[in-house]
């Protein structure tokens, strides 16, 4: 089991190409890569709670949302991001079983909380990996608090610790690691740790790819 790895992906420049072609759609990139698909977003008014909505693009469906037959992903970007995580796992010698979920998340500034709801993503032994797609404010907090997966089987509400139930002034959950976004950087950590997004600055959009990987 690995506690945390923070490293750049094999070829960080591919993130620039993706963002220019498929997110920003800048003129120079359109001229060079005519026909590159643009990201299609889904608005999620309720993520961990309705306090923290976001835009989302599914790369690989969560295990419980997958159809009994057919494709687990119809995203034109999954092959691209699958290669990135596969290379990262290989380059860092990370043994694993399979990728169970992948998603592009796009969040914006919020001023009603200093971070999102602390949460875990998956009810079994897994790593969470986050690839940062742009250089903007908005850290990831990895908390010094871990879930017991047996408790998740008994009570699924324990996936999330609602932000408003925590006494952040007098009895906060301590932050073990704070990861600041850097384009092309990946952080992979033990998925039993609760984690949360921090708000980006007004006028910015924070874009990441999040993966869950069982071991």
Name each region found by the language model.
Residues 1-95:
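Non-heme Fe(II)/2-oxoglutarate
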Residues 73, 78-82, 86, 91-215:
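Catalytic core of non-heme Fe(II) oxygenases with the double-stranded beta-helix
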């Amino acid at each position: 089991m690995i506690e945390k790895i923070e490293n750049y992906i094999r070829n960080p420049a591919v993130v620039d190409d993706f963002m220019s072609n498929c997110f920003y759609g800048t003129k120079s990139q359109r001229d060079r890569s005519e026909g590159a698909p643009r990201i299609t977003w889904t608005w999620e008014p309720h993520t961990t709670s309705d306090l923290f909505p976001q835009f989302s693009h599914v790369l690989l469906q969560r295990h419980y949302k997958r159809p009994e037959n057919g494709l687990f992903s119809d995203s034109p970007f999954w092959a691209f991001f699958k290669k990135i995580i596969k290379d990262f796992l290989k380059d860092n010698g990370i043994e694993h079983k399979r990728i169970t979920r992948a998603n592009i998340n796009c969040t914006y500034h919020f001023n009603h909380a200093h971070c999102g709801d602390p949460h875990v993503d998956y009810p079994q032994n897994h790593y969470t990996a986050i690839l940062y797609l742009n250089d903007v404010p908005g850290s990831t907090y990895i908390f010094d608090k871990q879930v017991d997966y047996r408790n998740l089987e008994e009570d699924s509400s324990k996936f999330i610790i609602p932000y408003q139930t925590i006494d952040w002034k007098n009895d906060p959950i301590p932050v073990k690691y704070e990861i600041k976004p850097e384009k092309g950087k990946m952080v992979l950590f033990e998925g039993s740790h609760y984690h949360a997004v921090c708000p980006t600055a007004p006028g910015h959009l924070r874009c990441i790819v999040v993966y869950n990987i069982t071991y």
